[in-house]
UniProtKB/Swiss-Prot annotation:
Residues 210-290 are annotated as: Lipid-binding and lipoprotein association. This is Apolipoprotein E. The gene is APOE. GO terms for biological process: acylglycerol homeostasis; AMPA glutamate receptor clustering; amyloid precursor protein metabolic process; artery morphogenesis; cellular response to lipoprotein particle stimulus; cholesterol catabolic process; cholesterol efflux; cholesterol homeostasis. It is found in: Secreted; Secreted, Extracellular space; Secreted, Extracellular space, Extracellular matrix; Extracellular vesicle. It comes from Pan troglodytes (Chimpanzee). Residues 158-168 are annotated as: LDL and other lipoprotein receptors binding. Residues 80-255 are annotated as: 8 X 22 AA approximate tandem repeats. The modification Methionine sulfoxide is found at M143.
Length: 317
């Protein structure tokens, strides 16, 4: 189960670039053809074969499911896969060294040194892949809510180079192991027979194990993808329900504010009318008094003008 999980987690890296690579021109990947040439049935080689199969499957997943993979658990599972792969590779190397006793010590030391270097390169490639995933997850979280198209394109370019380098180093490691086996044949026929007797059951066991993993891997992964899809749909529905509830609350608050504003406007109108009536009660007596005074003044002026206009009596009479 750990190998299955780890294979899915590693292959997700290429799945992140599926959307970007659909836009650019499709180019043939020669590494897939090389893969078929060097696979000979060893356990670590079969694991790499499943890696490429899962790679194509993960590319069919939706972006939502791919984003679900961007979690700390993914990094932990990927680290577990790397440790398990290197452990099996070291165990296989130890078995070969035990069976190569007829080979000269100098030849064994040289072959062992070359094999360790190839093994270290393969481990560094896997660590680089894990580091790219961690870096990508951090950048995606930092760019939350923004466009990640440029980030996906850059990651796609890095992952393509890493896939080629990983396959190249795995091919080199397979060749080193082949040299080990050739050295056993050159050493003694007895050693070769012992190696074949030991490796035969291991190869068959690896093939059976790979077939079992391949038959059981598809269904759990599909069920997990469906479960993720259902979780995403449930989250979307929950967010929609919360949004609707929030809109209803906002509408109620707006209605309350409107009612308060109308009430305050009515109060202001009443206060204005009361103030107007008060002003009228203050100034009406003054206006009436001024009107009376003005009328009296007009009457006096008219009376004065009438008196001055009367004729003066003549002295002749």
């Amino acid at each position: 189960m750990k190998v299955l999980w780890a294979a899915l987690l590693v292959t997700f890296l290429a799945g992140c670039q599926a959307k970007v690579e659909q836009v650019v021109e499709t180019e043939p990947e020669p590494e897939l053809h090389q893969q078929a040439e060097w696979q000979s049935g060893q356990r670590w080689e079969l694991a790499l074969g499943h890696f490429w199969d899962y790679l194509r499957w993960v590319q069919t997943l939706s972006e939502q499911v791919q984003e679900e993979l961007l979690s700390s658990q993914v990094t932990q599972e990927l680290t577990a896969l790397m440790d398990e792969t290197m452990k099996e590779l070291k165990a296989y190397k130890s078995e070969l060294e035990e069976q190569l006793t007829p080979v000269a010590e100098e030849t064994r030391a040289r072959l062992s040194k070359e094999l360790q270097a190839a093994q270290a390169r393969l481990g560094a490639d896997m660590e680089d892949v894990r580091g790219r995933l961690v870096q990508y997850r951090g950048e995606v979280q930092a760019m939350l809510g923004q466009s990640t198209e440029e980030l996906r394109a850059r990651l796609a370019s890095h992952l393509r180079k890493l896939r080629k380098r990983l396959l190249r180093d795995a091919d080199d490691l397979q060749k080193r192991l082949a040299v080990y086996q050739a050295g056993a044949r050159e050493g003694a026929e007895r050693g070769v027979s012992a190696i074949r007797e030991r490796l035969g059951p291991l190869v068959e066991q690896g093939r059976v194990r790979a077939a079992t993993v391949g038959s059981l891997a598809g269904q759990p992964l599909q069920e997990r993808a469906q479960a993720w899809g259902e979780r995403l749909r449930a989250r979307m529905e929950e967010m929609g329900s919360r949004t609707r509830d929030r809109l209803d609350e906002v509408k109620e608050q707006v209605a309350e504010v409107r009612a308060k504003l109308e009430e305050q406007a009515q109060q202001i109108r009443l206060q204005a009318e009361a103030f107007q009536a008060r002003l009228k009660s203050w100034f009406e007596p003054l206006v009436e008094d001024m009107q009376r005074q003005w009328a009296g003044l007009v009457e006096k002026v008219q009376a004065a003008m009438g008196t001055s206009a009367a004729p003066v009596p003549s002295d002749n009479h």
